[in-house]
Swiss-Prot record:
This is Pogo transposable element with ZNF domain. It holds the Pfam family zf-POGZ. The modification Phosphothreonine is found at residues 439, 463, 1368, 1378, 1394. It comes from Homo sapiens. The modification Phosphoserine is found at residues 333, 363, 425, 445, 856, 1338, 1364, 1367, 1373-1374, 1392, 1396. Residues 267-284, 345-361, 701-710 have a biased composition (Polar residues). Residues 860-870 have a biased composition (Basic and acidic residues).
Length: 1410
């Protein structure tokens, strides 16, 4: 059969009681299961008796024993009912070749026998047994049957030769120990085979025996042997030798007589007799012959003996065996089959048996389906209260029984057809018609159906149904969702116990709890770099986690992924075998406990809960799907799941806190909930083929000598029930190419990996597979490099827990790009360079003898001649198209560089090419913070690239995909240039020029170049528009509070927002610059009021403007009572202040610590400037020359925000309102403690209405932020820098600096106070006051006014020359500066490519600007 098909029978439920018990034993928890039958009712179906039974013997025994299945039991029941279980033996032994012989296979189940046999057991124990047989066997068998005896401890059994005692024959003895776990025992013969073969030779099993009553002497027969096998926990015994090859030995028929008063009566045997059989003596000549039905023997208990008890009880067992063998129908077995778990001997020899000459057949069996008013399935022992339910269950559980029951009446009325089997022997007294050959449908996995004689040929073809895995195993059930739609939803708020934040509804609270866990993982409190964020499984290494994410949680659909337990498998046959062994048809283990909605997929239940049960009081645990109604209980339960001691279900992705919950979940939910619709109404026995995909299945030849053809149509062999390990998917062609490449490289001697700089002792282990990082664009085939990448970039802790796995590169060996002049000694840097420059095809190794002259920081140029020589030595056309992974050899000669150029694994080369493990395309520190340059590196010119340093060397971005398309290669900025531009956008151009030692004009030119190419779309998944708006709002809020917005804080916040909203994303310098420009986040924009704010911020700004103007109109507030207040915090670095060369950087207006002093500015809408209050942290007397417009408050410990507002209100505002005697309005931001109850009460006491500016809106609607505040800060910066240059060699303390700041404040406030129109227009630009016509000005009009105000005030303060970077550069008068670099770019880029001009390069053009 095809390797992707599995033949399965339409069965609604296959969960046997022994499967439940094995689950419990696996979890080391013993529980009482009420589903297991604990009564002693035994339902027995006998099979045809075809052994040569003498007439006299049959006449004497028929009244007591009319079946070949004997159950020994007593009335005394053991009180320990928890260990009773079901033992099922299914032997479909039709008239064909039986599993054991046609003489009848007795099943001897002993349980506390009668006093005549003595006490031999004390308690029952669980022992399941199954016996199966194929359908296509021959019609007759020459060997008699053997009994099956099940006990709990080994006992001596005399293997007496038939000449001594013919009644001492034991069939199959299943010997187990109390408390021992024994899984199902399956005995499966091959077609045309039998387990008991005629043979010669008798080994001695034991030597002592308690005497028992002898039976009649039997005629001499050939010697027989025993078949001894040790049964492990799970055993499958297959008979493979065809019957035609077995040695047949004829024997003489035997006769024996048995007294009428035999032991079976005293044993309390249960004999089930078929209809038509008489309890009186029956003449075999008159007995009709019918086709033999399949025989199913079912018993409820197995006898148990305590392990420590030996001696006398063992003899009693032997007495019972010998006594039972005195019965003729049980004593005709030619040889015993002993199966013991205490014996180490194994053997399989043939025995001889008598030929059958006379058959006593029975009619259709009668199944005892009643048990105390309940209906019981004869196969799985499932209980039903209604007969119709049992009938429907049996149609799928045991259809062959139903089929034969339907045919019973017609078979009873019709005589049987004589068989063409062997003719009767001359010794037979009377011939009897034998059973015709008929092949019923077996109970499990029917291959084909042979038509019966009375069936039409058209109906003989077996129906076949082909189903996909999704249709057969997966499904969903709506539960009570329809009933819940009628009830109204009432949102319930929840308060987080960690941060006391109140969430609006249950879904927000659930997401908030997950956010706390993610924060713990980022802070390093929880080691989360090996935990899957999708299914919450723990992996041993980040590499295994990455492979799991790619195989299971990738967006690509896979035909080898189990959607129930969320595991991936290497091939479809393994996947199908897993589904057959682990899951049931229509299994839906994920259940919503609120409405009983269930599904086979976890994601469907999760989405269902978030959609249907939103705005309710229910809280869903994502780990075990438990529902809570209390927030504290949910939080405690949620945090307990973060611990290690959880119990994972091996059949799905759920994990539980207690083993009891796990066991209950497996018993209740891992079974068929609802059979697939395709199986409804099918004919019993329909063959169902399961396929993993719709495509044609592949055929794989099976090279097995001992496997019969029919075995290919059976189900695949059983596998372990343990959790499957993730399998790394890889195309077979690529796997073979990789193996060949690894073998070729292994013979090249000692190798060193250029990516991690470690030696490669074992190529398969060092390059196991090609993996991609799910958090960024990093890809590699080096396991050590991948681990290092995860540790360095995706483990969010301040101090790394693990050291990097890189070694220092070997000096003297460098990598050179064959398409440009880029040279480095770090393989990772070269990989980055090749990734971001697709047109650069490969790299080469420069041996130790060659040197590379790089452009130094002193202006030396590169050796262009050497560059051309290298290109001639390794011409680009000789390299493959894709980038290569280069491996350097320690044995390479200095004159001949050794290189192995390999294309990427997904893009396979020609068959003749040799492939090595895939290369390492990387992304520059995506998600993690880009490395900050050191002090020395920041002082370097950006264009001076130190090729040997991995810190300063960065590749050039190529977003276009080619150097000659659309925007030329020169239009793209390198990562280092983008970093400088980002610094200028976060701070300003002047600070960027000072920080990186680059001219401001060059930085502004880079910015213009980048804006010219801004229309290109970035490839890959970056932050969405919603996430970018959240980030833009954060930037605006940070600047309002004078908190730093730089490269580090920006990337940290972007990472946090991206993970919380999107999961996976990318961050780069190019994206960061585009983000700052797209949202107009430059700190000194002159037209900020016209810029578009984020959506939520813009809505809040509109509401604020409407509120303010409405209150001014309704309250008729005068302009003299409308005040705007804001604080300016000044930060002083005393260490920098005490230095000689960095004093100008000591005073800053951005910081995170306690401010050195706070300046409170206040202006009125009529153009008046209120006195400015300065709060100084320290002791200082009032300066004598302090301006009248400034008030000073000094205290050693400083002032809190509430104290600042209280002092300002007392010393400034209340004095002003006392003169006005009118209501007022105070415009202030929402930061600090402006919204505290103390501040609001203070304002209410002075009849002042607070107008609070929403967060992120100050740059547009705060009158002080429009023009005055930024100008004051720039003026203080300018004055301090001038003062720092003058006092470079003199000491300066904070008191002296404060006096200077007070003087400068007085100067700037004097200028502003002399321009009341400027102050009043600030309120108009901020839309606090309406325009002259009573309407709000347009954004363009306000932006023009803002630009005019800034220019006018800077001109009066003489700041225009220092801060004119946003305006158009003025023409220079110097002849040396009249040549613009842009003109040269336009000249060379106008009609041709810049690469065709060898006289100028990017660095040369940049140097002309200095």
């Amino acid at each position: 059969m095809a390797d992707t098909d599995l033949f399965m029978e339409c069965e609604e439920e296959e969960l046997e009681p022994w499967q439940k018990i094995s689950d419990v034993i696996e979890d080391s928890v013993v529980e009482d299961y009420n589903s297991v039958d604990k009564t002693t009712t035994v339902s027995v179906s006998q099979q045809p008796v075809s052994a040569p039974v003498p007439i006299a013997a049959h006449a004497s025994v028929a009244g007591h024993l009319s079946t070949s299945t004997t159950v020994s039991s007593s009335g005394a029941q053991n009180s320990d009912s928890t260990k009773k279980t079901l033992v099922t033996l299914i032997a479909n032994n039709n008239a064909g070749n039986p599993l054991v012989q046609q003489g009848g296979q007795p099943l001897i189940l002993t349980q506390n026998p009668a006093p005549g046999l003595g006490t031999m057991v004390t308690q029952p124990v669980l022992r399941p047994v199954q016996v199966m047989q194929n359908a296509n066997h021959v019609t007759s068998s020459p060997v008699a049957s053997q009994p099956i005896f099940i006990t709990t401890q080994g006992f001596p059994v005399r293997n007496v030769r038939p000449v001594q005692n013919a009644m001492n024959q034991v069939g199959i003895v299943l010997n187990v120990q109390q408390g021992q776990t024994v899984r199902p025992i399956t005995l499966v013969p091959a077609p045309g085979t039998q387990f008991v073969k005629p043979t010669v030779g008798v080994p001695q099993v034991f030597s002592q025996m308690t005497p028992v009553r002898p039976g009649s002497t039997m005629p001499v027969r050939p010697t027989t042997n025993t078949f001894t096998t040790v049964i492990p926990a799970t055993l499958t015994i297959r008979s493979t030798v065809p019957q035609s090859q077995s040695q047949q030995t004829k024997s003489t028929p035997s006769t024996s007589t048995t007294p009428t008063a035999t032991q079976p009566t005293s044993l309390g045997q249960l004999a089930v007799q078929s209809p038509g059989q008489s309890n009186q003596t029956t003449n075999p000549k008159l007995a009709p012959s019918f086709p033999s039905p399949p025989a199913v023997s079912i018993a409820s208990f197995v006898t148990v003996k305590r392990p420590g008890v030996t001696g006398e009880n063992s003899n009693e067992v032997a007495k019972l065996v010998n006594t039972l063998n005195t019965i003729p129908s049980l004593g005709q077995s030619p040889g015993p089959v002993v199966v013991s778990n205490n014996s180490s001997a194994h053997g399989s020899q043939r025995t001889s048996g008598p030929e059958s000459s006379m058959k006593v057949t029975s009619s259709i069996p009668v199944f005892d389906l009643q048990d105390g008013g309940r209906k019981i399935c004869p196969r799985c022992n499932a209980q039903f209260r209604v007969t119709e339910a049992l009938r429907g269950h049996m149609c799928y559980c045991c259809p062959e029984m139903v089929e034969y029951q339907k045919k019973g009446k017609s078979l009873d009325s019709e005589p049987s057809v004589p068989s063409a089997a062997k003719p009767p022997s001359p010794e037979k007294t009377a011939p009897v018609a034998s059973t015709p050959s008929s092949t019923p449908i077996p109970a499990l996995s029917p291959p084909t159906k042979v038509p019966e004689p009375n069936e039409n040929v058209g109906d003989a073809v077996q129906t076949k149904l082909i189903m996909l895995v999704d249709d057969f195993y997966y499904g969903r059930d709506g539960g009570k969702v329809a009933q819940l739609t009628n009830f109204p939803k009432v949102a319930t708020s929840f308060r987080c116990p960690h941060c006391t934040k109140r969430l609006k509804n249950n879904i927000r609270f659930m997401n908030h709890m997950k956010h706390h866990v993610e924060l713990d993982q980022q802070n390093g409190e929880v080691d989360g770099h090996t935990i899957c964020q999708h299914c919450y499984r723990q992996f041993s290494t980040p590499f295994q986690l990455q492979c799991h994410l790619e195989n299971v949680h990738s967006p690509y659909e896979s035909t080898t992924k189990c959607k129930i337990c969320e595991w991936a498998f290497e091939s479809e046959p393994l996947f199908l075998q897993h589904m057959k062994d682990t899951h049931k048809p229509g299994e839906m283990p994920y259940v919503c406990q609120v409405c009983q909605y269930r599904s086979s997929l976890y994601s469907e239940v999760d989405v269902h809960f978030r959609m249907i049960h939103e705005d309710t009081r229910h809280l869903l645990c994502p780990y075990c799907l438990k529902v809570f109604k209390n927030g504290n209980a949910f939080q405690q339960h949620y945090m307990r799941h973060q611990k290690r001691n959880v119990y994972h279900c091996n059949k799905c992705r759920l994990q539980f806190l207690f083993a009891k919950d796990k066991i209950e979940h497996k018993l209740q939910h891992h079974k068929t909930f609802r059979k697939p619709k395709q199986l409804e109404g099918l004919k019993p026995g329909t063959k169902v083929t399961i396929r993993a995909s719709r495509g044609q299945p592949r055929t794989v030849p099976v090279s097995s000598n001992d496997t019969p053809p029919s075995a290919l149509q059976e189900a695949a062999p059983l596998t372990s029930s343990m959790d499957p390990l993730p399998v790394f998917l890889y195309p077979p062609v690529q796997r073979s190419i990789q193996k060949r490449a690894v073998r070729k490289m292994s013979v090249m001697g000692r190798q060193t990996c250029l990516e991690c700089s470690f030696e490669i002792p074992d190529f398969p282990n060092h390059f196991p597979t090609y993996v991609h990082c799910s958090l960024c664009r990093y890809s590699t085939c080096c396991s050590r490099a991948y681990a290092n990448h995860m540790i360095n970039n995706h483990v969010p802790r301040k101090s790394p827990k693990y050291l990097a796995l890189f070694k220092n590169s070997v000096s003297g060996i460098k990598l050179a790009c064959t398409s440009c002049t880029f040279v480095t000694s770090v393989g990772d840097a070269m990989a980055k360079h090749l990734v971001f420059n697709p047109s650069h095809r490969s790299s080469s190794i420069l041996p130790r003898g060659l040197t590379w002259i790089a452009h130094s920081r002193h202006g030396q140029t590169r050796d262009r001649v050497h560059d051309r020589n290298v290109k001639n030595m390794y011409p680009p056309p000789s390299f493959p198209t894709n980038k290569a992974a280069t491996v350097k050899s320690a044995g390479a000669t200095p004159a001949e560089p050794e290189e192995l150029l390999t294309p990427l694994a997904p893009a396979l080369p020609s068959p003749a090419s040799t492939a090595t493990p895939p290369p390492t395309p990387t992304h520059p520190q995506a998600l993690a913070l880009p490395p900050l340059a050191t002090e020395g590196a920041e002082c370097l010119n950006v264009d001076d690239q130190d090729e040997g340093s991995p810190v300063t060397q960065e590749p050039e971005l190529a977003s276009g995909g080619g150097g000659s398309g659309g925007v030329g290669k020169k239009e793209q900025l390198s990562v280092k240039k983008l970093r400088v531009v980002l610094f200028a956008l976060c701070c300003n151009t002047e600070q960027a020029a000072e920080h990186f030692r680059n001219p401001q004009r060059r930085i502004r030119r880079w910015l213009r170049r980048f804006q010219a190419s801004q229309g290109e779309n970035l490839e890959g998944k970056y932050l969405s528009f919603e996430a970018e708006e959240k980030l833009a709002e954060w930037v605006l809020t940070q600047r309002e509070q004078q908190l730093p917005v730089n490269e580090e804080t920006l990337f940290q916040k972007a990472t946090k927002i991206g993970r919380s909203l999107e999961g996976g994303f990318k961050i780069s310098y190019e994206w960061a610059v585009r983000f700052m420009l797209r949202h107009h986040l430059t700190p000194h924009a002159r037209r900020a009021v016209a810029h578009t704010l984020p959506k939520d911020v813009a809505e809040n700004a509109g509401l604020f403007i409407d509120f303010v103007q409405r209150q001014i109109h309704n309250q008729d507030l005068p302009l003299s009572m409308i005040v705007a207040i804001d604080e300016i915090s000044l930060f002083l670095d005393t260490e920098v202040l005490s230095s000689d060369d960095r004093k100008e950087n000591a005073l800053q207006t951005v910081g995170t610590g306690e401010p050195w002093c706070d300046v409170v500015l206040a202006i009125l809408a009529d153009g008046t400037v209120l006195p400015t209050l300065v709060f100084y942290r320290g002791q200082m007397d009032q300066p004598a020359n302090m301006p009248d417009s400034i008030l000073l408050e000094a205290k050693e410990s400083g002032y809190s925000d509430d104290e600042i507002m209280e002092l300002w209100s007392t010393r400034v505002w209340q004095k002003h309102t006392a003169c006005q005697r009118s209501k007022g309005m105070l415009v202030m931001d929402c930061h600090r403690t402006h919204l505290s109850e103390e501040v609001l009460a203070m304002l209410s006491a002075s009849s002042t209405l607070p107008a609070v500016v929403p967060a992120g809106c100050s740059s547009k609607i705060q009158p002080l932020d429009v023009c005055i505040k930024r100008t004051v800060k720039n003026f203080l910066h300018k004055k301090w820098k001038e003062q720092a240059r003058e006092m470079a060699d003199t000491a300066c303390d904070s008191d002296v600096l404060l006096q200077l700041v007070l003087v400068w404040l007085g100067e700037v406030l004097g200028v502003i106070g002399d321009c009341p129109e400027l102050v009043q227009r600030s309120f108009l630009v901020a839309s606090v006051l309406p325009g002259p016509d009573g309407n709000i000005n347009s954004p363009t009009r306000n932006a023009d006014m803002q630009e005019e105000l800034i220019a006018s005030l800077e001109e009066q303060l003489k700041l225009s020359g220092e801060h004119s970077e946003s305006s158009t550069p003025r023409p220079r008068s110097s002849p040396e500066e009249t040549i613009e670099p842009e003109s040269l770019h336009q000249l060379f880029e106008g009609e041709s490519e810049t690469e065709s001009f060898y006289g100028f390069e990017e660095a040369d053009l940049d140097l002309m600007e200095i």
